[in-house]
Regions:
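Conserved, structured core segments of small domains
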Residues: 1-87
């Protein structure tokens, strides 16, 4: 396994969609964390007290292809929270 970094930047409807998909997103991350695959996960903010404008997730996967497939199923990705993301 190797570590990969996911960086997602919210789209114009990110805040509303984030609220809609938050519980499912957290549940998905909790499962990965329970499996020992999350090294770090947290929001991107413009300043300490601002609303989240994106996310960073550092996680373990077998390959870049596996990492892309895993993140493609994240509820925030599926729900359109992010305007763009990279791994």
């Amino acid at each position: 396994m190797a570590l990969f970094v996911f960086i997602g930047h919210d789209g114009p409807e990110g805040t509303a969609r984030r609220e809609q998909y938050r519980a499912a997103h957290v549940a998905a991350l909790d499962k990965l964390d329970a499996d020992g695959r999350i090294a770090f996960a947290g929001p991107i903010r413009d300043d300490a007290n601002a609303a989240s404008t994106g996310a960073v997730i550092v996680f373990d996967a077998d390959s870049l292809d596996a990492a892309k497939k895993l993140m493609a199923h994240d509820p925030y990705v599926v729900g359109g929270v992010f305007a763009n993301y990279s791994i």
